[in-house]
Amino acid sequence: MGDDPADGRRGLNRSLDFAGSIENTYICGMLPTLRQLQYLKFLAEHGSFGRAAEAAHVTQPTLSAGIQELERTLGAPVVDRARSGVILTAVGEEALRRATVILNEAEELVEAAKNAGQPLTGRFRLGVIPTIAPFLLPIALPLLRERFPKLRLFLREDLTQRLIASLKAGLLDAALIALPYDMNGLNWAHVSDDELFAAVPADSVLAGKESATPEELEREGLILLEDGHCLREHALAACGLKPPKAADEENFAATSLPTLVQMVGSGLGVTFLPGMAVEAGLARAAPVAVRRIEAAHPSREIVVAWRAGSNRGVEGKLLAETLRTR
């Protein structure tokens, strides 16, 4: 049997009814409380009223009553209740998405009020990409502790795409990332330019030269980080090279720079290393030679980024300024 058009109309009407209920709620001055939104967040995270109540440090009846009040305010159920636990409805999913942003903004408000006139004090959530974290943080963290003793730094290491998504969602205050990258909706401050080098087997012909051309590196067989690591795109773009064929990448790819160095040292091919990794001595972990790349601008730009319009912009600039003086 075909789809019943009435089902589509009922779904559309349901959406319109929900939108209408939101509008009517606003007009009547009935808005969800932050506590109710927190209850919804705990419920989504823990999957049951009992565990959510424990996480919220309230009784189960209190949390249940808060969710019911939220549903009355929104004019629609936010969860489906079952013996196996609770599942968010479509309305609940949308409410949770918006609640997450609202709760993060509320936390930012509290932190901003506490730290007014005292930047980089209190909680600060900083994201760092994997090709920066192990090389910059050992230098940066002691410096930040010395200059900002009241700073409580929470670090998250992840790929650029996910860090930017977290910035825009208000889950991070700033992130140390590398450009070029699509920075729509973000502001940033320059930290440094990081030159890219070629890492080749110590017994290879290229090891006997002072520098290598992109074409020479390509002929030796490129080994790159897995797709998603921005260093991969930066190096290829700087050298004017195309990504290796999919069939080749299935055999030779890595998830970290230390693994790449070991693969090069074993004679599997050549790769690119950022200058900060070379300075940290990463290439000394295997029989590898580091050579300059004969290209116009074989480098990436290290920046501190934050969400456009965020009140953390002043602190983002101060963080970048501090890291520039390291």
Task: Identify the meaning behind each predicted range.
Residues K41-T62:
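Short helix-boundary/capping micro-motifs
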Residues T33-L34, S84, A90, K114-A133, ...:
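Interdomain hinge and pocket-entrance segments immediately C-terminal to HTH DNA-binding domains
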Residues L159-I164, K168-L172, I177-A178, G228-A289:
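Hydrophobic hinge/microswitch elements
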Residues F49, E71-E93:
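A short LG(V/I)-centered, amphipathic sequence patch enriched
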